[in-house]
Amino acid sequence: MKPRVRSEFVKSGYVFAKSPADIAKEYGFTEVAMLGSNENPYPPSDKVLRAAEAELSGVNRYPDPKAAAFHAALRTYICDCPVVTSGLGMDGVIETVIRTIVEPGDKVVISTPTFSMYGLAAKAASARVVNVSRSADFSVDLDTFLNEAKDARLSFLCTPNNPTGTVTPVEDIEYILDRIEGVLFLDCAYVEFSDINYLPLLSRDNLIIGRTMSKVYGLAGLRIGYAFVPEWLEAPYNIAATPFTMNRLSEAAASVAVSDAAYRESFIAHVQKWRDVFMQEIPFPVYPSGSNFILINVAPQKGDAAAESLAKHGVLVRSCTSFPGLGDTFIRVSVGADWENERFLAAVKKL
């Protein structure tokens, strides 16, 4: 008898960080330093919260299917070009792009180690997934990547990369775009924490730039992803997407958040300050990062063991053993609130 469930969904899926509630209960903490999911530790600004609250009385009605207010805000404050959205974060954008472009058996290339959703979503679409390893310093080896990506239907590259923090230079992206037959999805979820700007490359018709409201804008709980796309993709994407890609609260909050430069710049400065402190004070090899997190090699310890040891001190970090091609001696730590960062530094020095 043929199995009732597809094989892609039997073995494994997305790996979540350990629950803060579980750590608190297990080790007796009233507060846990939540540094495992690359979140913004601070709530949105009051004006963002007020915008969301104002929509509560209208939730009996469906939201705007075109998310016009949010799109207008993005074009005003970020980039005046075609944009698409998803109410399921960057994950939803990735899944919809794949649904729009990729047919069963098509080749999808992924620069690894990286965010697992590219591969999971591509396999769910019955694509032929090819992982291309980065160099020892986690930079992209252009020739190695292009050897596979040149004839791929769709390729994924994350910059700054999750979980390594590596920033790929603009000229390297241009080099890739000039030499591929298909489309490059550039995941820029963390780009605001770097000093790099890929938006001028959007004149290319084979580039998608994905971004999110979850990180610098502090709206992870609302699950808002968006992408700047070539004109030819905008209409097909919207046909392939699920109806109502944003709810009323998320559109209202996001529309105000993108205009709140003071909030954004304040958090970026906070991240950059603590990122430098982490680089200086962590007593293990760390890697340069253009993001709101740091990758740490805790060898000879294993990543799982180090994460568990830190949990005993009330600190939640991400063990990176689930990232293919990375090895089992790495952990990733996000920049949190001051007290969280201080607790982490005290704990990591005891490993």
UniProtKB/Swiss-Prot annotation:
The modification N6-(pyridoxal phosphate)lysine is found at residue 215. One of its GO terms (molecular function) is pyridoxal phosphate binding. GO terms for biological process: L-histidine biosynthetic process. It is an enzyme of class 2 (transferase). It catalyses: L-histidinol phosphate + 2-oxoglutarate = 3-(imidazol-4-yl)-2-oxopropyl phosphate + L-glutamate. Keywords: Amino-acid biosynthesis, Aminotransferase, Histidine biosynthesis, Pyridoxal phosphate, Transferase. InterPro entries: Aminotransferase_I/II_large, HisP_aminotrans, PyrdxlP-dep_Trfase, PyrdxlP-dep_Trfase_major, PyrdxlP-dep_Trfase_small. Its EC number is 2.6.1.9. Pathway: Amino-acid biosynthesis; L-histidine biosynthesis; L-histidine from 5-phospho-alpha-D-ribose 1-diphosphate: step 7/9. Its cofactor is pyridoxal 5'-phosphate. PANTHER family: HISTIDINOL-PHOSPHATE AMINOTRANSFERASE, HISTIDINOL-PHOSPHATE AMINOTRANSFERASE-RELATED. Belongs to the class-II pyridoxal-phosphate-dependent aminotransferase family. Histidinol-phosphate aminotransferase subfamily. HAMAP family: HisC_aminotrans_2. This is Histidinol-phosphate aminotransferase. It comes from Methanocorpusculum labreanum (strain ATCC 43576 / DSM 4855 / Z). The lineage of its organism: Archaea, Methanobacteriati, Methanobacteriota, Stenosarchaea group, Methanomicrobia.
